[in-house]
A protein has these predicted regions:
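Small-residue-rich segments of transmembrane alpha-helices in multi-pass membrane proteins
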Residues: 33-39, 86-94, 145-161, 206-212, ...
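Extended hydrophobic alpha-helices typical of membrane-associated regions
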Residues: 81-87, 236-290
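Intramembrane alpha-helical segments
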Residues: 83-163, 254-263
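Solvent-exposed interhelical
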Residues: 58-109, 179-227
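Helix-coil boundary and interhelical linker segments in multi-pass alpha-helical membrane proteins
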Residues: 37-57, 105-119, 154-175, 227-240, ...
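C-terminal ends of transmembrane helices
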Residues: 66-79, 127-140, 185, 189, ...
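Haloarchaeal acidic low-complexity proteome signature biased toward cell-envelope/secretome components but also
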Residues: 1-26, 262-272, 287-290
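Functional transmembrane core segments of multi-pass inner-membrane proteins
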Residues: 144-197, 211-214
Length: 290
């Protein structure tokens, strides 16, 4: 016989874990951790010393951009992700204040320390204006590219901070991250099909269908993996960069299951968690192999 107390305890634990994950996703803490993961991955793969300041800057900029976006997209979220819309309506103003404060702090620290690239910290504000206010998200596929490029600037920012902007490793990670995030952005649009149609936003899934979006994204992921292997085989990149193929494998596994009825945790935790996964794999290989 099953122990009722144990079953109830397991259900309670499961509910608690789900509640915590939803909080991390809806509050943008998890997506901010994901962008920090990109910075950490870049630092280790490019053999740079780990410092806290660039990580803080990335975290603060992400929290600011995504929290503002929650407010500008709240009408779409009411249909696509009602739980997130409810969270934003109830707690969003507190997280908005937090995001703005962190962003101002990051800019202030950069200026105070005399960082040469401090002016580039205004790029997140430009992204917010273009994407959320300027109507870029209504342009077919352009919004996916903007998201991809925004994430791709993280390796560039890390490279600039350490004076390695033109190194092959940094440039490779810029292209790689930009491409992989663009693919993820297309997959993300699958959950937003109905809301995007209502708002008149044209995306790959609502123009060609979710099936075509999954197939094209999977093909693109395989092509990226093949390009990585080619660069390594040609001696342009170290064999250490084979580790990024772990993310291609991860992405290839979640793409087939991306449907419009998947909950916010699938997209906000599983899909957005791809870079956290890659960071963990990179750290493990650095510790155990290299």
């Amino acid at each position: 016989m099953h122990n009722p107390t144990r079953i109830q305890w397991r259900r309670g634990l499961t509910s608690l874990i789900i509640a915590v994950l939803r909080f991390l996703v809806h509050s943008n803490l998890f997506i901010s951790l994901a962008t920090v993961s990109v910075a950490v991955t870049t630092i280790f793969l490019a053999n740079l010393p780990l410092e806290s300041l660039p990580l803080f800057i990335v975290f603060a900029a992400t929290m600011f951009v995504y929290t503002v976006n929650r407010f500008t997209d709240i009408e779409e979220d009411k249909q696509n992700v009602p739980q997130r819309a409810a969270f934003t309506k109830r707690y969003g103003r507190y997280w908005l204040v937090t995001g703005i404060a962190l962003y101002i702090a990051a800019v202030g620290v950069a200026i105070t320390l005399g960082l040469s690239g401090a002016a580039y910290l205004f790029l997140p504000l430009v992204v917010v204006l273009l994407y959320s206010v300027g109507g870029v998200k209504r342009l077919f596929f352009v919004k996916n590219l903007v998201v991809g490029l925004a994430w791709g600037t993280i390796p560039l920012g890390v490279g600039y901070y350490y004076g390695q902007l033109r190194s092959l490793e940094i440039l490779f990670l810029f292209v790689y991250i930009t491409t992989m995030i663009t693919i993820a952005a297309v997959i993300f649009d699958i959950k937003d099909i109905e809301g995007d149609r209502t708002e008149g936003i044209s995306t790959v899934p609502n123009r060609f269908g979710p099936g075509w979006a999954r197939i094209s994204s999977l093909v693109a992921t395989v092509v990226v993996a093949a390009a990585v292997v080619f660069l390594i085989a040609a001696g342009m990149l170290s064999r250490r960069y084979l580790v990024v193929l772990a993310m291609n494998a991860y992405v290839s596994m979640y793409i087939p299951f991306a449907t419009s009825d998947r909950g916010p945790l699938y997209y906000g935790f599983v899909v957005d968690g791809e870079h956290v996964f890659l960071m963990v794999i990179v750290l493990l290989t650095e510790w155990l192999v290299w």
